[in-house]
Amino acid sequence: MTTDTIVAQATAPGRGGVGIIRISGDLATNVAMAVLGKVPKTRYADYCDFKDADDRVIDQGIALFFKGPNSFTGEDVLELQGHGGQIVLDMLIKRVMQVSGVRIAKPGEFSEQAFLNDKLDLTQAEAIADLIDATSEQAAKSALQSLQGEFSKEVHELVEQVTNLRLYVEAAIDFPDEEVDFLSDGKIANALYRIIAKLDTVQDSAKQGSIIREGMKVVIAGRPNAGKSSLLNALAGKESAIVTEIAGTTRDVLREHIHLDGMPLHIIDTAGLRDTLDTVEKIGIERAWAEIATADRVLFMVDGTTTDAVDPHDIWPDFIDRLPTRLGVTVVRNKADLTGESLEKSQEQGFDVYRISAKTGLGVEELKQHLKSLMGYQSNLEGGFIARRRHLEALELAASHLQLGKEQLEVYLAGELLAEELRMAQMALSEITGKFTSDDLLGKIFSSFCIGK
């Protein structure tokens, strides 16, 4: 843990009404004496002159002092709130750095100090950056939920349950004559099943939180000439893709990034899927399947003039069978202007079905509302927590260890191996909040923050 005293501009660079300089560390009181001639009363706004080394006034403003550990970073913190001119702020930072032992903060170092001093866990620290970077009200609300500890609470509950079960299993191992009875009486199995079910729920919520933060990747897929490129253009609100009556016009992957009520949506238009001898088209089809493999949702585009079927298993069973497990699919029956179909949404064998005309725009707004709901949009803004890709990976790793532990229990009654899988699951979960985290990961996370945060 660093013992340096750090300084940085806490407000955005450039011209503004107010500019804030933040200092954190043991030398914050030395800085106060040098710049203000006194240490302000803790947690009181003090109007002061900010002076240079020759006792000349650089600026005038509000000084705030927070005595550690009752501060954001857990250290002594001094904030100087002056006028927002960049030259004045630069002069003030230079003055602060004339105090021996003070240096410029690295990006995210204030938040890192808060984490290292147990003022925040890692998910809460990340939520600060996510709140700043939020591109929608929903993302901001979810980031605030994480900052207030909603995600951490879920993870801590899982860690506690895994730890308690691990201790119970290890206690059984310590009594080898009774180990088999302990493992086979159903108590351990039931506890493990409850943990796995709880983790599944948290994973679903985290995936939703990741979509709110990073956006949802939606791949438009289907046979040639189903209207995929027309739908891309309709969703994007511009002519992004070339549209013709010639099957196979789209040979490569086309991408559009749009916002629906501020929520990011990444739309991927792909080549029509079919058997072909054309080398270039084959490459496009391979790329289409690669995009589908990493999608959050597939819009299965169907030419409504070629079939009356609505169940995707009836329309194209080979396509549905090849899709990744648990990948959500929305069936989009296109050309409703020609078929005269009702635009009402329906459900077929668990699949959402929408009727639209990508050419005229009929039903497109309803499809947009559907995509918004999939991204977790809620008009009352009572959304869940925000999540990052690393959180999803850690949850997936924990889930895999729990599944392996389940196998060790059910098939082999192997207590020691079950305990080891529980230990690995515990470590994976604890990495989310930073209980067990490498220095490399901390550096990567906090270096992406703003300087001054």
Swiss-Prot record:
| UniProt cross-references to Pfam families, sorted A to Z | MMR_HSR1, MnmE_helical, TrmE_N
- GO CC terms: cytosol
Its BP terms in the Gene Ontology are: tRNA methylation; tRNA wobble uridine modification
Which PROSITE patterns has this protein been placed in? Answer: G_TRME
Q: Which NCBIfam families match?
A: mnmE_trmE_thdF (TIGR00450), PRK05291.1-3 (NF003661), small_GTP (TIGR00231)
- Family membership noted in the UniProt record: Belongs to the TRAFAC class TrmE-Era-EngA-EngB-Septin-like GTPase superfamily. TrmE GTPase family.
The protein's name in its UniProt record: tRNA modification GTPase MnmE
The organism of origin for this protein = Shewanella denitrificans (strain OS217 / ATCC BAA-1090 / DSM 15013)
